[in-house]
């Protein structure tokens, strides 16, 4: 097969721990580039500047027995000191790393309103749900229940999430799909086979450092990449966890708001449960209506409210400890947990379903991390949130020691009479904030899953110009509201909603535990004993809690379980259909024999202009191009196959956005452009801006390609006369500058924008110009060829740019199984017709659009 030229705009180099060691890196400065043999994945279709070595059709001759190894420029070398610091110069950094101290304090203050609302409102209902399953018989029951709550708080939110899981973020991005993305960067586990080796040269893609556990990590990587079953299991696990996150986004508002509004029954005797439901519905409508105003704006508003709430929890707790029974401090002795189970047996086991509610919101700490930094979340939780929560629970326990009958409304009954109405007011505000916390986490998770091909396309609005992670999804917002209202109206019992709440939360927790364990083995490469201890302790505890809530699934929580199954089905069907479609496109791509037969005119008329043909292939000529050739009376003089590809990184730097390749020879004027985006990237550019960036990147690619050819030809000439011209070796720097590799090294440089011909003069200027004067004629021809091609691009651009899109219909083959026909022909087709159209998603103007229909038989 012929080869295809590849040139990447990457400015960084992957640090591969499997080769070389770091001693070689010190040989050059950290900003220098090097030339390496072209990767296998960068070779596919023939290219050449001239006709040398090519047959009459213009494509590479099949008679060449020795493959031609093209040299490509990699990114700059990474200094060993940068490796030790785990930093790469120029690599994208987290949005929050360069903030001032004052800004970090303000950021920590905002975390109260965005991250901790969910876990902060858990005292409203935890004891109420626990004692509904295991009624209080004596004071020791209260001590045992408090001990369970305290150690659950310490074990799950603090140790697991704040101290461990937060560090598994993907460049500041948290959530289930962020963990999956992090694993995908280190092992090819995606079921859609569109990975390229060139993706690993993105500066933010990977940073591997040798360590003693590397061999174990490589073995695990090999197993994951070679086992289709393991890939599917991992995908199912991630989709199940994501569906539980979405379910959590439904049940959290229902639980928090109804618990807060239910306090009216304590203050006003005439208030009934039906009235509580009606007020809760009104509050929920207001809550979801305010969601569009963004996290930054709302964070400044709700931050003070949550601060007052946490201070109220601590104040009420201290008051009750002083007034009632301070002996509840005995609950810090874990032996009371044993006594609690010994006295209450099966009821104590059921009570675990209520106990886990004290840790609800733990996943939001991680999922909402994209809005804030790890340090701000850790600082706020340890210094403010955890102490206030523990004092609040201890205060309720002190009150219940002498008032067993008030266990059904433990929180509001423990509030002093003079402070009841202010606390009720701030509790409702806090409940609304808590609901918003999980909704924002759901938005983040859906955006990640959409970018990674596991959820239908939706309209995403970025609510902040400064921070890309702050988003709002209108369709999902109103969908969550509708389902939430159904839950509130159909399940009016706090106990039943609490059971559903625990089920959704535990589903996400168990998924996170397994994924973080894989990260420990594959990426962190820490001691196996620590990994096993983490998995056994946390997964074991979560399974015990889950066994409690699943036993009560018939009490009404089955609604949330059904909802989660539906969301899982949507995501799996979308991923399955997308995978089949991509595989079909790969199978049906046009062969190089056909391209050779068509010739440079492609068997039709070439009209002036540029055609941007959007497709999903990263290699080969898409089949839809053949449909355009047979359908349209003419095709554009220049065609660029544009592939919008999301890579498993949060952000792709702008200077590494486009990866260009030449398809066939120069006379064909065919190129492939892979526009790479991270799942956190905001695609806000207009079509004019996108066209401008694309054309500029194409020109840079052509210039650098010409320089490669020039360097290769110079290298061949210099092989016979290296002693006469010691300064003839040249590299290209990261900014496009050309460096002479004479003695001393890097003695001088020439700017990329200067014509190549200017660097080749007569022999009396050899000391100032690195090129051999004997190659003046060949360089002149190369320069003229370069200028002609650049002029051709400019004229084509002036003639206009047209977007060529294929409107594909996906159908299952007639010989397919019935289930496959049902899934593809009905479910997947329904999702495609009702998701956001590709035209809107790509910002393609209607006046510059051409579409051709095509049916894919999968």
Swiss-Prot record:
The lineage of its organism: Eukaryota, Viridiplantae, Streptophyta, Embryophyta, Tracheophyta. The keyword Cell membrane applies. Residues 1-68, 707-731 are annotated as: Disordered. Belongs to the HAK/KUP transporter (TC 2.A.72.3) family. GO terms for biological process: potassium ion transport. It is a multi-pass membrane protein. The modification Phosphoserine is found at residues 719, 721. Residues 126-147, 254-269, 319-345, 402-413, 492-496, 540-552 are extracellular. InterPro entries: K+_transporter (IPR003855), K_trans_C (IPR053952), K_trans_N (IPR053951). The chain crosses the membrane at residues 105-125, 148-168, 233-253, 270-290, 298-318, 346-366, 381-401, 414-434, 471-491, 497-517, 519-539, 553-573. Residues 1-104, 169-232, 291-297, 367-380, 435-470, 518, 574-858 are cytoplasmic. Keywords: Cell membrane, Ion transport, Membrane, Phosphoprotein, Potassium, Potassium transport, Transmembrane, Transmembrane helix, Transport. It is found in: Cell membrane. One of its GO terms (cellular component) is vacuole. Probable potassium transporter. This is Potassium transporter 7. NCBIfam families: kup (TIGR00794). The gene is POT7. It comes from Arabidopsis thaliana (Mouse-ear cress). Its main location: membrane. One of its GO terms (molecular function) is potassium ion transmembrane transporter activity.
């Amino acid at each position: 097969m012929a080869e295809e030229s590849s040139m990447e705009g990457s400015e960084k180099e992957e640090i591969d721990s499997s080769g070389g060691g770091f001693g070689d890196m010190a040989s050059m400065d950290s900003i220098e580039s090097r030339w390496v043999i072209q990767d296998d994945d960068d070779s596919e279709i023939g290219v050449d500047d001239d006709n040398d070595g090519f047959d009459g059709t213009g494509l590479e001759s099949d008679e060449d027995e020795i493959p031609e190894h093209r040299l490509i420029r990699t990114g700059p070398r990474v200094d060993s000191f940068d490796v030790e610091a785990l930093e790469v110069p120029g690599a994208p950094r987290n949005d929050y790393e360069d903030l001032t101290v004052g800004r970090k304090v303000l950021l920590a203050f905002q975390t109260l309103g965005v991250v901790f609302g969910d876990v902060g409102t858990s005292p409203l209902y935890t004891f109420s749900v626990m004692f509904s399953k295991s009624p209080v018989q004596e004071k020791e029951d209260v001590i045992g229940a408090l001990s369970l709550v305290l150690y659950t708080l310490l074990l799950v939110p603090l140790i697991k999430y704040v101290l461990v899981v937060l560090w598994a973020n993907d460049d500041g991005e948290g959530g289930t799909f962020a963990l999956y993305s992090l694993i995908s960067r280190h092992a090819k586990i995606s079921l859609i086979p569109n990975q390229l080796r060139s993706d690993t040269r993105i500066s933010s893609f990977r940073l591997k450092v040798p360590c003693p556990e590397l061999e174990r990590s490589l073995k695990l990587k090999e197993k994951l990449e070679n086992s289709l079953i393991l890939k599917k299991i991992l995908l199912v696990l991630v989709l199940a966890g994501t569906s539980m996150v979405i379910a959590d986004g439904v049940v959290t508002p229902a639980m928090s708001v109804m618990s807060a509004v239910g306090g009216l029954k304590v203050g006003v005797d005439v208030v009934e449960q039906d009235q509580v439901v009606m007020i809760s519905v009104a509050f929920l409508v207001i809550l979801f209506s305010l969601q569009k105003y963004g996290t930054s704006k709302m964070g400044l508003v709700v931050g003070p409210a949550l601060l007052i709430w946490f201070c109220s929890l601590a104040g009420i707790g201290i008051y009750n400890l002083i007034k009632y029974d301070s002996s509840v401090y005995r609950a810090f002795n874990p032996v009371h947990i044993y006594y609690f189970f010994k006295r209450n047996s099966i009821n104590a086991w059921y009570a675990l379903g209520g106990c886990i509610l004290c840790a609800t919101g733990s996943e939001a700490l991680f999922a909402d991390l994209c809005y804030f930094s790890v340090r701000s979340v850790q600082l706020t939780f340890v210094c403010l949130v955890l102490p206030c929560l523990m004092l609040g629970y201890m205060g309720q326990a002190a009150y219940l020691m002498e008032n067993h009958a008030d266990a059904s409304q433990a929180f509001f009954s423990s509030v002093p009479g003079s402070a009841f109405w202010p606390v009720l007011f701030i509790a409702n505000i806090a409940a609304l904030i808590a609901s918003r916390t999980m909704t924002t986490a759901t938005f983040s998770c859906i955006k990640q899953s959409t970018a990674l091909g596991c959820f239908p396309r939706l309209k995403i609005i970025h609510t902040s110009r400064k921070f890309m992670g702050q988003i709002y999804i209108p369709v999902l917002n109103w969908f969550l509201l509708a389902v939430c209202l159904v839950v509130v109206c159909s399940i009016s019992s706090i106990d039943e909603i609490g059971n559903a709440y625990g089920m959704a939360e535990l589903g996400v927790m168990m998924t996170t535990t397994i994924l973080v364990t894989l990260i420990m083995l594959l990426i962190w490469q820490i001691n196996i004993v620590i990994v096993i201890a983490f998995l056994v302790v946390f997964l074991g505890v979560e399974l015990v809690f889950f066994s409690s809530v699943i036993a009560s699934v018939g009490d009404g929580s089955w609604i949330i379980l059904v909802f989660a199954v539906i969301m899982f089905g949507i995501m799996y069907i979308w991923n399955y259909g997308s995978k089949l479609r991509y595989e079909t496109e790969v199978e049906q791509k046009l062969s190089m024999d056909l391209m050779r037969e068509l010739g440079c005119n492609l068997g039709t008329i070439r009209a002036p202009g540029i055609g941007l043909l959007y497709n999903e292939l990263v290699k080969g000529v898409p089949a839809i191009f053949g449909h355009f050739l047979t359908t349209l009376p003419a095709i554009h003089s220049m065609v660029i196959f544009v592939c919008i590809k999301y890579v498993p990184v949060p952000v792709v730097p702008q200077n590494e956005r486009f990866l260009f390749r030449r398809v066939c020879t120069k006379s064909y004027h065919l190129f492939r452009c892979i526009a790479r985006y991270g799942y956190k990237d905001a695609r806000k550019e207009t079509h004019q801006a996108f066209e401008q960036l694309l054309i500029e990147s194409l020109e840079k690619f052509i210039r650098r390609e010409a320089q490669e050819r020039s360097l290769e030809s110079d290298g061949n000439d210099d092989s016979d006369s290296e002693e006469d011209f010691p300064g003839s070796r040249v590299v290209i720097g990261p900014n496009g500058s050309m460096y002479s590799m004479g003695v001393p090294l890097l003695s001088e440089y020439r700017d990329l924008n200067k014509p190549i011909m200017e660097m080749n003069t007569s022999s009396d200027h050899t000391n100032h110009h690195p090129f051999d004067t004997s190659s003046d004629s060949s360089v002149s021809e190369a320069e003229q060829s370069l200028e002609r091609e650049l002029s051709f691009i400019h004229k084509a651009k002036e003639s206009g740019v047209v977007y060529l899109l294929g409107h594909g219909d996906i159908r299952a083959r007639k010989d397919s199984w019935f289930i496959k026909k049902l899934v593809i022909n009905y479910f997947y087709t329904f999702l495609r017709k009702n998701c956001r159209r590709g035209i809107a998603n790509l910002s393609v103007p209607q006046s510059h659009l051409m579409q051709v229909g095509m049916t894919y038989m999968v």
